[in-house]
């Protein structure tokens, strides 16, 4: 699944081809995605794109009259193509620009979506989201306060979008390893120092992933078709049975909140 760095990479990749240009039309080939594509999108014409941004794992295209909001789901991607490029069977939506470029959305599993909102402040999917992990609002004091009385595993806590957005499975695994915390550690038992370290490492890991173009998983490509390169730097995710990079102990895995979790039993004692 594309996580925050992958969505940020996608945003950065398509911005030069969209920002400041007019949308000629939006072609919706398959409206039945995770949530049905907003019917307003097919009516958009001659609207200028004024900016692109991201909230959590949502890609936001700002126009003069409202906002096109996309989520890449489990296997979705966006890329820049021209009218000459053939359409794939999983190419569900095109945003056709007046500069000859097309932003094409491909999603084999159809778990993504494209929606319309006239007002971001009232957009229902954003109302209960926590702070952005790279913002000043996400700090040690905030995380420690949120962790009090929480009896859930710390990995669940970090992946709760009402606590902080965009820390998905890959980066939760990596961060907990860097902090020496077992994924099943009870959240309420976190110390202030541990919360401070978590905040530091989450920010560090996400920034590094963004700089390197997202994580190379089987489905993720950058908008120009190149893979991300951060998977080469992952220390523990997906490496069950491999030696821990710190101590050499075999990496183990377990399921936490229906997601695979990887940890070193020596470095991350419960």
Curated annotation (Swiss-Prot):
Any one GO molecular-function label of the UniProt entry: class I DNA-(apurinic or apyrimidinic site) endonuclease activity
Binding site for DNA: 90, 109, 150
TM annotation in the entry: none
Cofactor details (free text): Binds 1 zinc ion per subunit.
PROSITE patterns, per database record: FPG_CAT (PS51068), ZF_FPG_1 (PS01242), ZF_FPG_2 (PS51066)
Full protein name: Formamidopyrimidine-DNA glycosylase
The protein's assembly and partners: Monomer.
Organism: Mannheimia succiniciproducens (strain KCTC 0769BP / MBEL55E)
Paired cysteines (S-S): none
Active site: 2 (schiff-base intermediate with dna), 3 (proton donor), 57 (proton donor), 259 (proton donor)
GO biological process: base-excision repair
Zinc fingers (FPG-type) by residue: 235-269
Task of the protein: Involved in base excision repair of DNA damaged by oxidation or by mutagenic agents. Acts as a DNA glycosylase that recognizes and removes damaged bases. Has a preference for oxidized purines, such as 7,8-dihydro-8-oxoguanine (8-oxoG). Has AP (apurinic/apyrimidinic) lyase activity and introduces nicks in the DNA strand. Cleaves the DNA backbone by beta-delta elimination to generate a single-strand break at the site of the removed base with both 3'- and 5'-phosphates.
Lineage summary: Bacteria, Pseudomonadati, Pseudomonadota, Gammaproteobacteria, Pasteurellales
Entry keyword DNA-binding: yes
UniProt cofactor(s): Zn(2+)
Family statement drawn from the similarity comment of this UniProt entry: Belongs to the FPG family.
InterPro entries named in the record: DNA_glyclase/AP_lyase_DNA-bd, DNA_glyclase_Znf_dom_DNA_BS, Formamido-pyr_DNA_Glyclase, FPG_cat, MutM-like_N-ter, Ribosomal_uS13-like_H2TH, Znf_DNA_glyclase/AP_lyase, Znf_FPG/IleRS
Enzyme Commission identifier(s): 3.2.2.23, 4.2.99.18
Swiss-Prot/TrEMBL keywords: DNA damage, DNA repair, DNA-binding, Glycosidase, Hydrolase, Lyase, Metal-binding, Multifunctional enzyme, Zinc, Zinc-finger
Reactions it catalyzes: Hydrolysis of DNA containing ring-opened 7-methylguanine residues, releasing 2,6-diamino-4-hydroxy-5-(N-methyl)formamidopyrimidine; 2'-deoxyribonucleotide-(2'-deoxyribose 5'-phosphate)-2'-deoxyribonucleotide-DNA = a 3'-end 2'-deoxyribonucleotide-(2,3-dehydro-2,3-deoxyribose 5'-phosphate)-DNA + a 5'-end 5'-phospho-2'-deoxyribonucleoside-DNA + H(+)
């Amino acid at each position: 699944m594309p996580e925050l760095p992958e969505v940020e990479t996608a945003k950065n990749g398509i911005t030069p081809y969209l920002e400041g240009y007019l949308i000629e039309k939006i072609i919706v080939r398959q409206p039945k995605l995770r949530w049905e594509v907003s019917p307003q999108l097919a009516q958009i014409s001659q609207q200028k794109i004024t900016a692109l941004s991201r909230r959590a794992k949502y890609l936001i295209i700002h126009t003069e009259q409202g906002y096109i909001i996309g989520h890449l789901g489990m296997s979705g991607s966006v890329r820049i193509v021209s009218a000459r490029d053939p359409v794939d069977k999983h190419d569900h939506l095109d945003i056709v620009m007046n500069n000859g470029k097309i932003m094409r959305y491909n999603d084999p599993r159809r778990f993504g979506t494209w929606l319309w909102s006239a007002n971001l402040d009232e957009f229902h999917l954003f109302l209960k989201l926590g702070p952005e992990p790279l913002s000043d609002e996400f700090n040690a004091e905030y995380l420690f306060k949120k962790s009090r009385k929480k009896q859930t595993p710390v990995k669940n806590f970090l992946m709760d979008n009402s606590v902080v957005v965009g820390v998905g499975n890959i980066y939760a695994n990596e961060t907990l390893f860097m902090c020496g915390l077992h994924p099943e550690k009870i959240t309420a038992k976190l110390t202030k120092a541990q919360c401070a370290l978590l905040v530091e490492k989450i920010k560090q890991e996400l920034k590094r992933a963004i700089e390197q173009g997202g994580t190379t998983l089987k489905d993720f490509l950058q908008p120009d078709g190149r893979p991300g390169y951060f998977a080469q730097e992952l220390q523990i995710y997906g490496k069950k049975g491999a030696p821990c990079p710190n101590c050499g102990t075999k990496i183990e895995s377990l399921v936490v909140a229906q997601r695979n979790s990887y940890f070193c039993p020596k470095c991350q004692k419960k």
